[in-house]
Amino acid sequence: MRRFWAKGGYGEHGRSCFLMEYGREGRYCMVDCGIMDSDSQPYPDVTSEELSKTDYLFLTHCHKDHSGAFMEFVKRGFCGVLAASQMTIDLSNISYEKQIVLPVDEKKTPWKTKIYEITLTYGRTGHCPGGLSFYIEDEKGAVFFSGDYQEDTLA
């Protein structure tokens, strides 16, 4: 990753959102897009320009503090690809055409796939049904996101 920004969720419960410049300069991928509905500014601090330059949005899980801003981000200019487990997409009530459903095979973990310039390794977190952690790599570096993690699995 060329650069990394915490756009929300850092030092607070809610608004989880992390933006990374990757591969091609000026292009982004994002992990999570949560809301904090107890705040007068519930959405992460992401500009419309950043959203329009975001190629991929990876969701760790369905809880609104990690996925609740998705449709607002689409309204503000996100038109990239959503990547998440089918369970996360379903439980988040997201209807969006451009998506990559990350398969979760019970027999094999972690899972690894290549999405253009990004190598994505992901695995279950146990926090909730469909919850995933992500290890995202490009030619400049890598970053790991656990989402919310639970040692004693709930899902």
List PLM regions with ranges:
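His/Asp/Glu-rich metal-coordinating catalytic cores
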Residues: 1-58, 63-155
